[in-house]
Amino acid sequence: MTALKNDRFLRALLKQPVDVTPVWMMRQAGRYLPEYRASRANAGDFMSLCMNPEFACEVTLQPLDRYPQLDAAILFSDILTIPDAMGQGLYFETGEGPRFKKVVSTLADIEALPIPDPHKDLGYVMDAVSTIRRELNGRVPLIGFSGSPWTLATYMVEGGSSKDFRKSKAMLYDNPQAMHLLLDKLAQSVTAYLNGQIRAGAQAVQIFDSWGGSLSAAAYQEFSLAYMRKIVSGLIREHDGRKVPVILFTKGGGLWLESIADAGADSLGLDWTCDIGEARRRVGSKVSLQGNMDPTVLYANPQAIRSEVARILASYGKGSGHVFNLGHGITPEVKPEHAGAFLEAVHELSAQYHE
């Protein structure tokens, strides 16, 4: 494979020296970009965009073509590809978000679920990874990703997104045996899926635990973190002669950073409710940190965006081990020039911390 021209993202994840703080944005290929909206219209719908490797490659590269400051590309896909490959029948309803034709509600439902083969059942994702990696031609590293077992389980049990996770939590407390079996199957599936992405060309991987923060402290340890730890222990950590860093991101996980840092990953994603300086004092000796600007700051004027970037950089302080990002995904209404101001500010203002 082509040698990397810009590896500062991978270096920062491993706390190796960098010239400036690297930056990328969760959902950087998304609806805030007019070129993305045009591609989505051409594809017909969101799933057609995900399932066609050429379209997935096109939209993955769009933010990089617009913003030369981006230090990483992230595979354009959806976290719900795994449940779909298990036969749940994923579809999207306008204004409703993701839905499943089948809902998991009993132990028998869970026992019947297959563990998808990443190459046979999710080959379109592997093809997208290899296509994107080829087209990147060493420009920046490519991030692969998956949802966490707990997060995927909530969608499968609820039948879609949820505000209170009533059905998922009822199963967790009322029928923990069933929930553990579901989470175990998902952990096996995620491990195989991420290893497939790494073999196809992903140079780092992130596990999105979007709904881990909805759990109590005890339930988080048992039903979310334990399964992410299992996945991390089964991942390929070196490929093509280079380490493959692993990032864990639990939204709402700021209370549990110490235990997340013990899970074996290289880096922790932080949402915007954490102070990054405090997080560094708590776990910075073990892991690098990724984050953590509130994405709604991007609605503000460029000077306000710049001030918030400066504040977060100062809070983290000197040295490597910080990948700048948002604390969650960029939202569709953000002006593209505001995202550009954010990315420019990170590189410009961070050089002083790496002298």
Curated annotation (Swiss-Prot):
Primary subcellular site in the record, as a coarse category: cytoplasm
GO biological process, one term: protoporphyrinogen IX biosynthetic process from glutamate
Catalytic reaction equation(s): uroporphyrinogen III + 4 H(+) = coproporphyrinogen III + 4 CO2
Subcellular location: Cytoplasm
InterPro entries: UROD/MetE-like_sf, Uroporphyrinogen_deCO2ase_HemE, Uroporphyrinogen_deCOase
Cross-referenced PROSITE patterns: UROD_1 (PS00906), UROD_2 (PS00907)
Domain of life: Bacteria
EC class of the enzyme, as a word: lyase
Pathway, per record: Porphyrin-containing compound metabolism; protoporphyrin-IX biosynthesis; coproporphyrinogen-III from 5-aminolevulinate: step 4/4
Pfam families documented for this protein: URO-D
Record GO terms (molecular function): uroporphyrinogen decarboxylase activity
Keyword entries, A-Z: Cytoplasm, Decarboxylase, Lyase, Porphyrin biosynthesis
KW Acyltransferase (keyword) present: no
Residues the UniProt record annotates as site (Transition state stabilizer): 78
Coiled coil ranges: none
Gene Ontology cellular-component terms listed: cytosol
Family statement: Belongs to the uroporphyrinogen decarboxylase family.
Function summary: Catalyzes the decarboxylation of four acetate groups of uroporphyrinogen-III to yield coproporphyrinogen-III.
Quaternary structure and interacting proteins, as annotated: Homodimer.
Name the record gives this protein: Uroporphyrinogen decarboxylase
Organism: Pseudomonas fluorescens (strain ATCC BAA-477 / NRRL B-23932 / Pf-5)
Gene name of the encoded protein: hemE
